[in-house]
């Protein structure tokens, strides 16, 4: 039973939250935001403004330590910390790296390094056909 929410119905999330980081090419956080739309307790969302403490940190070795310093213990929320240290950091690296590589590989005739690194960048995908038609190959 969840007293704060008068129970949690089947199919309803116990945790429903999001995190958004605005980064530069050096992986420095310029803005950090979060929202807790559903949580086990009504006070869980009170800490989302604490994410501002991440502004100025860089997602690089030591990121997890910095996140824990800013948001660990009673200053934060375990699921939000986990999002930041796990999928958030990985997604940031993939996004920034891909953008940097696209700019570097914009040289005519050079195959972009991201081709065939995932489903979206498969050499026979519509994305490759649109962005790098010279390197598109029919399946």
Where do the model's predicted regions map?
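Active-site- and interface-proximal helix/loop "cap" or "latch" segments in soluble metabolic
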Residues: 2-139
